[in-house]
Amino acid sequence: MQRNRRIEYLEDGRCRMTWNDVSARQVLRRIFDAAVASADPKIAVVNNLPERPRGRCVVVGAGKASAAMAAAVDAAWPDVDLSGIVVTRYGHAVPAGRIEILEASHPVPDEMSIKAAEKIFAAVQGLGPDDLVVALISGGGSSLLVSPTGKMTLTDKRAVNQALLASGATISEMNTVRKHLSAIKGGHLARAALPAKLVTLIISDVPGDDPSEIASGPTVADPTTLADAAAIIARYGIDLPESARAVLVQGNETPKAGEVAGEIRLVAAPSIALEAAAAAALDAGLCPLILGDALEGEAREMGRVMAGIALSARDKGLPVAAPAVILSGGESTVSLGAMTEGRGGRNTEFLLSLAVALKGASGIWAIAGDTDGIDGVEDAAGALVAPDSLIRMRDAGIDPRATLSAHDSYTAFKAIGDLVVTGPTLTNVNDIRAILIG
């Protein structure tokens, strides 16, 4: 690592270590990979398993990490009377022995999302007090586990999801709406599992790690109300199908505290991932500064704000002096407004906005990506930004500002070869952003 850095002597005789492009890119990728590795289900799940049941064990689950979590449970308990079924995103399945793995669509549900919900709901019914239900919940479960309520159809559910994703609502707000339009989310699955013992193992992808929000809380009492959901729809002017509007007016409330029981264990989370990223930064000789694991807001606005922080760190040593890395987690949003044909997720949009705001500033590199390996609906986890990113984009015929306005950030980073492609990581602790100031 030392050969990729050099000593720069300042006018007052002081010296500082500076970074070249190769070393900065390598370190940023190691930082991102360390964050992902901290949420490896094989380790996180096994270390948090409950006591073995006297009766049967039924494993259910939903999310991008659910198949890998299920495989860990099956391998850890070879002598337990165990069966089950979980649903994960297409392309994220792995063999899990006695536990059936289904795949469904994300972020917009399909027919398999409904079939998975039906099978999982049936699997937890008819159990006794000596039986154990282990629920494996991770990000993405909201679209993978779908049980329309009222007169809603799959087409209606898809329309709701698409409207929510384009609205600019936070993930918490979107999940509040989803819970009140579902017969399985918002604690309904926990109610169905009674009187069996219920233990939920969660890999969190939501800011603040609220278990009632992760995958829309199928096994957790719901603190939100129908009125809350209706207020969110009004606040963002979201156009819902008539069947969905009827549910918000006439539907039944989700189970509340005292109506369902169960133990919740958080096995991996954004905060843990950021600590792992910080440790990797220290190993590389960088001073890590964690801004928080729950940053939210418009991706392009977040990019502009982060550019200001990075420039202040480089020029003034505030809020941290170079060499340093500024870390953050959480989930930004992208408000599309009128439909566009642009490609890209929230992380590449954040990075393109950051690059535009930095205007090619020297000594600053950045990486941002979704820890599940998929930024939005694209085939990349995210991308990298370097001081020469804008120049290389223009050389490739890309106008960075126009591309940002068109929400076409994926195209910009693909043109310069700076997408970060990991493939499905089989876990999900939301987004990780790291800005290196050399």
Swiss-Prot record:
EC number annotated for this UniProt entry: 1.1.1.81
Catalysed reaction equations from the record: (R)-glycerate + NAD(+) = 3-hydroxypyruvate + NADH + H(+); (R)-glycerate + NADP(+) = 3-hydroxypyruvate + NADPH + H(+)
Enzyme class: oxidoreductase
Pathway entry: Carbohydrate acid metabolism; tartrate degradation; 3-hydroxypyruvate from D-glycerate: step 1/1
Keyword Oxidoreductase in annotation: yes
UniProt key word NAD: no
Superkingdom, taxonomy of origin: Bacteria
Keywords (A to Z) from UniProt: NADP, Oxidoreductase, Plasmid
CC terms in the record's Gene Ontology section: cytoplasm
A GO term for molecular function: hydroxypyruvate reductase (NADH) activity
Induction remark: By tartrate.
Database matches in InterPro entries: GK-like_C_sf, GK_N_sf, MOFRL, MOFRL_assoc_dom, MOFRL_protein
Pfam families named in the record: DUF4147, MOFRL
Role, per record: Degrades an unidentified toxic product from the first step of tartrate degradation.
PANTHER family in alphabetical order: GLYCERATE KINASE
Protein name stated in the entry: Putative hydroxypyruvate reductase
Source organism of the structure: Agrobacterium vitis
